[in-house]
C-alpha cells in the first residue's frame, strides 16, 4: 500500500471537529448495541464491544449512554431496535466506487434515502459485486501521530502481524488482516500507544485520482450519505494530490 489514506485522514479530522454530535452518537450507540447483541455484554470477552465502547469514549459520549446501550444490546434492558445490516454499492461522480454500510430497522427507508442521495449527488446505485470486487476487508487502527515514534510504532505493529503502517500527517494508520485486528490493537496498547479507533474497514485495491472539482463533488456526496441516519460507514476508492487535499481542507 502506498500514498496517503485520504479517507482515514478525512474521517479522523471530521470526528475531531464534528458538530453533528447527535448523529455521531447515534451511530456509535448502534455499534455498541450490535456488538453486545452478537458477542455478549462483557467487553473483556468481546473485543468488538471493547472497541465500540472505546470509540464512543473517545467521542466523549457520557458513560451512562454507553452503559445503557450495552444493556440494550445484551438484552438486559428493553428498547433495543432490531437492526438489519445492509450493504449498498454505488458510484459517485468521476466513476468513484462507493460501499455504503447501513444498520437500519426499516429496509425500505434506507434503500430509498440512499438511492435519492446518490441521485441528487450525480451518483447511482450499482449492482451487487460491481464495486465490491475492487475492495478487500482489512483491520484499521488509527493512532494520533503527535509525540509518537513512527519507527517504534511500525516495529511493534509488524511484530504483532500488521501488514502496513502509513504516515497520514495527523495520524498513523495501521493496516492488518481482518482476523489480526484485535491482536495488533492489544499489542499497541501493551506497548503504550494511544489510538483513536480500531475498526474493520473496506480498503480499495485500486484508487481513482480526482481533480479539485471532482473531489468537491465526491466529498459532498459522501458527506450527504454520512448524514443519513441509517448509514454507518462509507468506503470509497478516490484519492487526490496533496495540493487538492489542502484546498479541500481550506474550504
Curated annotation (Swiss-Prot):
* Protein localization: Cytoplasm
> What's in the keyword line of the UniProt record?
Cytoplasm, DNA-binding, Transcription, Transcription regulation
InterPro entries reported for this sequence:
Integrase-like_N, TACO1_YebC-like_2nd/3rd_dom, TACO1_YebC_N, Transcrip_reg_TACO1-like, Transcrip_reg_TACO1-like_dom3, YebC-like
Q: By what name is this protein known?
A: Probable transcriptional regulatory protein Blon_1155/BLIJ_1182
Give the Gene Ontology MF terms in alphabetical order.
DNA binding
Which example biological process does GO assign this protein? regulation of DNA-templated transcription
Family to which the UniProt record says this protein belongs: Belongs to the TACO1 family.
Q: Which PANTHER family match?
A: TRANSCRIPTIONAL REGULATORY PROTEIN YEBC-RELATED, TRANSLATIONAL ACTIVATOR OF CYTOCHROME C OXIDASE 1
What GO terms fall under cellular component here? cytosol
The yes or no answer to whether the keyword Cell cycle is present is no
Q: Which organism is it from?
A: Bifidobacterium longum subsp. infantis (strain ATCC 15697 / DSM 20088 / JCM 1222 / NCTC 11817 / S12)
Amino acid at each position: 500500500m502506498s500514498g496517503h489514506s485520504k479517507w482515514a485522514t478525512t474521517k479522523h479530522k471530521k470526528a475531531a471537529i464534528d458538530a453533528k454530535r447527535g448523529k455521531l452518537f447515534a451511530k456509535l450507540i448502534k455499534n455498541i448495541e450490535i456488538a453486545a447483541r452478537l458477542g455478549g455484554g462483557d467487553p473483556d470477552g468481546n473485543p468488538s464491544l471493547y472497541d465500540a465502547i472505546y470509540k464512543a469514549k473517545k467521542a466523549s459520549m457520557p458513560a451512562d449512554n454507553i452503559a445503557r446501550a450495552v444493556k440494550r444490546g445484551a438484552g438486559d434492558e428493553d428498547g433495543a431496535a432490531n437492526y438489519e445490516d445492509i450493504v449498498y454499492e454505488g458510484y459517485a461522480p468521476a466513476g468513484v466506487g462507493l460501499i455504503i454500510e447501513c444498520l437500519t430497522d426499516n429496509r425500505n427507508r434506507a434503500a430509498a434515502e440512499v438511492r435519492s442521495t446518490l441521485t441528487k449527488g450525480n451518483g447511482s446505485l450499482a449492482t451487487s459485486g460491481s464495486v465490491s470486487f475492487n475492495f478487500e476487508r482489512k483491520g484499521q487502527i488509527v493512532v494520533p501521530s503527535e509525540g509518537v515514534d513512527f519507527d517504534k510504532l511500525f516495529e511493534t505493529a509488524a511484530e504483532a502481524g500488521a501488514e502496513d503502517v502509513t504516515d497520514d500527517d495527523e495520524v498513523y494508520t495501521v493496516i492488518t488482516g481482518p482476523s489480526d485486528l484485535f491482536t495488533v490493537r492489544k499489542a499497541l496498547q501493551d506497548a503504550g500507544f494511544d489510538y483513536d479507533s480500531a475498526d474493520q474497514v473496506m480498503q480499495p485495491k485500486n484508487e481513482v485520482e480526482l481533480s479539485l472539482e471532482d473531489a468537491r463533488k465526491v466529498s459532498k456526496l459522501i458527506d450527504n450519505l454520512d448524514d443519513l441516519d441509517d448509514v454507518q460507514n462509507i468506503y470509497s476508492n478516490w484519492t487526490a494530490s496533496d495540493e487538492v487535499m489542502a484546498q479541500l481542507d481550506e474550504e
